[in-house]
Amino acid sequence: MVVEIMDTTLRDGEQTSGVSFARQEKLSIARLLLEDLKIPRIEIASARVSTGEYEMAKQLCEWAEKRGHIDKIEILGFLDKGASIEWIRSCGAKVMNLLCKGSEKHCTFQLQKTVQEHVEDIKQTIKKAKEVGLKINLYLEDWSNGIQHSPQYVFHLMDALKNEAVERFMLPDTLGILNPLQTLKFCRAMRRRYPDLRFDFHAHNDYDLATANTFAATLTGIQGVHCTVNGLGERAGNAPLTSVVAVLHDHVKATTGITENMVNKVSRIVESYSGIRVAANKPIIGESVFTQCAGVHADGDNKNNLYYNDLLPERFGRKREYALGKTSGRANIRKNLESLGIELDDESIKRVTQRVVELSDKKEMVTPEDLPYIISDVLKHETIAQHVKVINYTLNLSQGLKPVAIIAIEVNGKTYEGASTGDGQYDAFVKAIRKIYKEQLGRTFPSLTNYTVNIPPGGHTDALVQTVISWDYNGNILKTQGLDADQMEAAIQATIKMLNLIEDKAVSYTHLRAHETGAYL
């Protein structure tokens, strides 16, 4: 079974609140749809909208003509005494999707015409369009209401037009009111009454049933369906292209010709152009949908792929990921280590897992990019004795005033308090500790020689921060690091690790020698 997909991202999708594609964005999306995804048909505009829309449509049609795609370009037209026909013809397009009324209410109250008058207008428009070489598809706007509440109107309209030069009769669920059982019933009625006609189904997602209704429509033999990238469209949107393609391929066993492994790329580009973010859990294209969080799932994947289904991420140009968090367990850690090419013994994996759990209490998810930093943090500091601990600290930052740090630390079991101002919050923190060491402990405090902040790639504001600080202690260089989602906390961790190194006399020589090998602590 072949199901023809018509993408209306550039027409109906642009009717999403707050979305307006620039001309070059529309041209870019059209190229992606036709040449990367291999969409059979795309609806690019509504006739007579604006001068800018006309220039875009004309430029796109010129490109499509050169690339052999011109018959795949469609433009929405209206019953306006031939004005839409001329607009579309002068753009260079070959197909007009003519909007007529698919319910008696729309015909009576919006057009204020009888069905006979409406039929005559449609026939005259079809005749004019054919005279200038345009092909016609016919939208029955509000068909879902019409077939439920005024079926005789719908059948009267269809009986009068079934022998006209119409390529496709397109059945919109304009207000998104149908459920799958109703879609089956009404589409089947149309197919049985008019078996020789070609029908498209056009879903809207008001009840979150657009994909299910599209699926139901194809079960009745409907030959074409309409979608948009990321489900863009009026109100709750249209049927999302990626979900519809997957359902047609896997559940209908239909052929669409769509290149599945390009859908994620196209989705991301349209997301960027539209400014409408894709939900993380949106099927197939959401950021998290191919991420296993539970450790038992990762363990099952290690044992004959027990938690796989037909929606393999590679089908859609993506990769499976294993989340690092409090529920992930060692199986998830192992999966991520494999992907990074890192091998650790069981005891090290146990320590890394414990650290991931600790971090996940502060951060919703630890990313794979964070993992090398965590490993370095855990394995390089596992033997440092905890002679110095931070009991509490307060950092104040106020407009026009110097930052203030108030701290309480424990050194060898005894608590000390200190406070200081500084040029920054960390500077104030270090000066407060230096006061404690000099004034209360009578000890030398190392001087800071270098301070480096590393943030894993990805650009997330909640990414783990690795802070590496170099210290000069009596002519010896120490290098310590901290790791946290908060940059200040990471710097404080690095500072406390340094203090523990110099406090632990038994291991100080060993750690000081690490500098000579290029290692950092």
What are these regions (language model features)?
Residues 510-517:
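Conserved small/polar residues in nucleotide/adenosyl-binding loops
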Residues 53-75, 120-131, 186-199:
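Alpha-helix-loop-beta-strand connector modules within alpha/beta enzyme cores
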Residues 15, 20, 29, 369-478, ...:
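Non-catalytic terminal/interface segments that mediate subunit docking, oligomerization
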Residues 1-80:
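N-terminal capping/small domains of soluble enzymes
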Residues 9-25, 74-80, 109-113, 142-151, ...:
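Active-site mouth loops of central-metabolism enzymes
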Residues 2-3, 7-9, 253-419, 459-464:
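A mid-to-C-terminal "edge-of-domain" accessory segment
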Residues 23-39, 86-98, 102-107, 120-135, ...:
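Alpha/beta enzyme core
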